[in-house]
Amino acid sequence: LAEMKREDHEVVWYEDFLKFLKDEEVFYTFLTPSAYGGPDCRWDTARNTAFSELLGFYSLSHWYAWQVSILGLGPIWISDNEEIKKSTAAKLKEGGIFAFGLSEKEHGADLISSDMELIPDGEGKYIARGDKYYIGNGNVAGYVSIFAKLKEKKKEYVFFVVETNHAKYECTQNVVRSQKYVAELVLHDYPITDREILLRGRDAWDASLATVAFAKFNLGLASVGIATHSFYEAINHAAARKLYGSYVTDFPHIKQLFNEAYARLVAMRMFSYRAKDYMRIASESDRRYLLFNPLVKMKVTLEGEQVIERLWDVIAARGYEKDVYFESATRDIRMLPKLEGTVHVNMMLTVRFMQSFLFDEQAVADVAASESPNEEEFLFNQGATTKGLDTIPFGPWRPKFKSKAAKSCANTDVLVQQIETFVKMLEKAAPSPEQSKDIDWMLSIGEIFSIIAYASLIIEQADLGGPYAPADVNLVLDQILSVFVRDISRHALELHEKSSSTAEQQKLFLEMIRRPAHNESRETKIFEKVMALKESYRMAP
């Protein structure tokens, strides 16, 4: 821990970690499709999901090298450029990491406004001119996948690869003070041939969005890892500390903070690993993952912030000290909701699924939980990920809240009452065209809908059991649902108070405010679970 913290504070570039990745062929094994690698190589979502959490558990900066490599590899594996694919596999085997050249300083991720140009320079030849900003691994990447426009065809987008050791490639700075390298780069008339071009036109556009669609999933798992490590530190500290003659963990408000943090953290993990199952079975005919992935990115990362806030209220000033993991966690946990599209962007994306999720009764296939070795080739064949989202079927929502696990929880009935009132609002007092354009108002609507979808998968995970459902799962599920009841009540109150809400809507929002089904025995048992974690993990000093 001490060495990790020293390197974090001194912003040491992690060459030792990159050497480990090379020596153990980690990225080569995990990020090379089987068609291009050795016998253990495959793009296995279950394996990658667990590895994302593991890296986040120790260091977000080290996780970042993994995350932006996944982004950089997306357009390559999506493309039909076999020569570059084989070269990429070779670079991975040699320990290479990768970068995703999408964002620009002046335009962020506004693809339409991209200034990077690919300029024709004779038959099959081009020069690349322009700059990119906020490009992770841009200092040493084996390949940087660059999104640009053909100069003479402004509406024709293109993806091509460049190498960071080329004379016409300039990495001008690390734009953040961190171990992670987030580059500003400039291409000074970098020579490109057809060999380096990955995708053109609509295919390039779709590849940029498809890559983000599956890669942003990893941000939620990083949050799970950070929050888990922080929880261990917090309970170890609080349970051993005496104030005014009592252990900190004896105070009622501390018990409440720990219980809520525990419930939110368990929910984060249950949802994320259940959402992973939907990505594993994704196909052209089953695109439910396009809702659940943004929720992992947006909802799980926000919940991670909530967990850290509760734990920080417990350990107070200890969370600022330079020698604890928690000090880094308070900084890093806040980054994740803001990467790969802001919370607002992803929230508005989830709202597009609301009609089909809540009103479409079309039957859909059940999805099995699976940790078995598999390869998700569809992730590189998604096509357009932004079309037809409002028609993707999810099956009727009510049966999900009548499952065996759901029926065991007193808070299920309270939560369903809130959901039914929300559905009634959408039917009887639907958002007006003006309200639908009011992003502030719609974000609050999205908050409530996201809780509904979030709860549905957590209930599924509880019914399935397995490694990501806790012991005494029904007890923990009821605790989780009590948190969701309070969250919906809070958002309903916000909507009631907004000036743009109509009188009928205000009435229905007030009806959504409900008291959770409290149970002192349950609270006591949950806190026993919290205390059982004392000294179950402590990082080597």
Regions found by a protein language model. Give the residues of each.
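A short, Trp-centered hydrophobic/proline-enriched beta-strand micro-motif
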Residues: 94-103
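Flavin-dependent oxidoreductase catalytic core characteristic
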Residues: 1-30, 34-57, 62-63, 86, ...
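A short core secondary-structure module
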Residues: 125, 129-169
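Short, solvent-exposed loop/turn segments at the edges of secondary structure
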Residues: 70, 95, 111-113, 139-143, ...
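N-terminal glycine-rich flavin-associated loop
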Residues: 63-83, 108-111
